[in-house]
């Protein structure tokens, strides 16, 4: 999870 996106 990074920058509000999955994975």
Swiss-Prot record:
Modified sites of kind Serine amide: 7
Any one GO molecular function term: opioid peptide activity
Superkingdom of the source species: Eukaryota
Modification sites for Hydroxyproline: 6
The entry's keywords: Amidation, Amphibian defense peptide, Endorphin, Hydroxylation, Opioid peptide, Secreted
GO biological process terms on file: defense response; neuropeptide signaling pathway
Tissue specificity: Expressed by the skin glands.
Keyword Phosphoprotein: no
Family the entry assigns: Belongs to the frog skin active peptide (FSAP) family. Dermorphin subfamily.
Name assigned to this protein: Dermorphin
Organism in which the protein naturally occurs: Pithecopus hypochondrialis
Lineage per the UniProt record: Eukaryota, Metazoa, Chordata, Craniata, Vertebrata
